Amino acid sequence: MTKGRVIQVMGPVVDVKFENGHLPAIYNALKIQHKARNENEVDIDLTLEVALHLGDDTVRTIAMASTDGLIRGMEVIDTGAPISVPVGEVTLGRVFNVLGEPIDMQGEIPDDARRDPIHRPAPKFEELATEVEILETGIKVVDLLAPYIKGGKIGLFGGAGVGKTVLIQELIHNIAQEHGGISVFAGVGERTREGNDLYHEMKDSGVISKTAMVFGQMNEPPGARMRVALTGLTMAEYFRDEQGQDVLLFIDNIFRFTQAGSEVSALLGRMPSAVGYQPTLATEMGQLQERITSTATGSITSIQAIYVPADDYTDPAPATTFSHLDATTNLERKLAEMGIYPAVDPLASTSRALAPEIVGEEHYQVARKVQQTLQRYRELQDIIAILGMDELSDEDKLIVHRARRIQFFLSQNFHVAEQFTGQPGSYVPIKETVRGFKEILEGKYDHIPEDAFRLVGRIEEVVEKAKQMGVEV
């Protein structure tokens, strides 16, 4: 163990000088352990990660926890290896911090548990799997218009408060209940309250036994928020590579990963690039995203919530993330204001899996017809606002009539929101979703009032709701 001393503390960035010309490798973990000698001092147990070499014997590091109480001259020990976190069965049902330490008060992880470093190379080119398979989510708007790919990367885009986290919670619920798969949840720079709620909900629903959770929340220093996504990814990689599982990796929120990088970038002495972001933005994102993939042994399907600053999709952070994604689910504030939940924009959401050779001809044609109908309705809205419905041709009136039913039928109740709405959630298989929309497009339900289509699951529930409203079906 080689020792050094703290020579400078700049918020979350700490400079350390080592003896005898020793220089720890980039990404090595350094430890500072200090017992308080009087009441004015605090106990310190801090991990630093080497980020830069300054000269022959000095390194600049990023702290993984608060640097409160740190003083120049304190002793630092080089561990000789990167941060390593526990992997395997011991992680299931547990909650960890960025260093892989349990924070759920359920006891320590056994000393003999396997630990893997959080910095690892992406799988080799020849190890990657190429076949495309659809992952059924049970959420109609997703399955019909922007289906998710097994082993793909999916982005949930949206501004503040439009429902990204609720959608992620529903996906965790549906995939655990219907597919029995293992999930890893990485909470990156989001609200601690939401993480706590999610943990308790998953405990109550029994999903927690199939899930590992890692948190580096809003109140933590940028070092923890930068690395917590890698901690979660390392746990997911073990299940993929060693156990051949299809794993789900949820990251909420990938924007905070970029944001944390930009917070320390200037302190590390880098010149800022566009909009003040770090110049290494694309590289950092690429290193994370390239490890999330399908291999010959198993797959990691990643669902990432992406906060869009001020609803500006051209901002470098969301724009850089876009290039890595197979499918995008865009959440739209206008739809949330109309009471359509999930507030997914059916025209802006995309997926490379929406192709006849992947989803089948019928599904593809129904999805395209739904999008055409909604697009035409959007074009007609200005005319309706100025001249009213009466000025439309009969054909356009019919399009508006059906588009409104489609728009409402794209909404549904969520299992995870039952306690707020008082309505049971619904899981709709893809086959049922395609059949329901096909029948609406054919005009089979033109006589049913549009309110009957709001927040229901299968098309049969629409008919049932209409009967309760006293409509002849």
Swiss-Prot record:
GO terms for molecular function: ATP binding; ATP hydrolysis activity; proton-transporting ATP synthase activity, rotational mechanism. SMART domains: AAA. It comes from the Bacteria. The keyword Cytoplasm does not apply. Keywords: ATP synthesis, ATP-binding, Cell membrane, CF(1), Hydrogen ion transport, Ion transport, Membrane, Nucleotide-binding, Translocase, Transport. It holds the Pfam family ATP-synt_ab_N. ATP binds at G158, G159, A160, G161, V162, G163, K164, T165. It is a peripheral membrane protein. It is an enzyme of class 7 (translocase). It catalyses: ATP + H2O + 4 H(+)(in) = ADP + phosphate + 5 H(+)(out). Its EC number is 7.1.2.2. It is found in: Cell membrane. GO terms for cellular component: plasma membrane; proton-transporting ATP synthase complex. PANTHER family: ATP SYNTHASE, ATP SYNTHASE SUBUNIT BETA, MITOCHONDRIAL. Belongs to the ATPase alpha/beta chains family. Produces ATP from ADP in the presence of a proton gradient across the membrane. The catalytic sites are hosted primarily by the beta subunits. F-type ATPases have 2 components, CF(1) - the catalytic core - and CF(0) - the membrane proton channel. CF(1) has five subunits: alpha(3), beta(3), gamma(1), delta(1), epsilon(1). CF(0) has three main subunits: a(1), b(2) and c(9-12). The alpha and beta chains form an alternating ring which encloses part of the gamma chain. CF(1) is attached to CF(0) by a central stalk formed by the gamma and epsilon chains, while a peripheral stalk is formed by the delta and b chains. This is ATP synthase subunit beta. It comes from Geobacillus sp. (strain WCH70). The lineage of its organism: Bacteria, Bacillati, Bacillota, Bacilli, Bacillales.
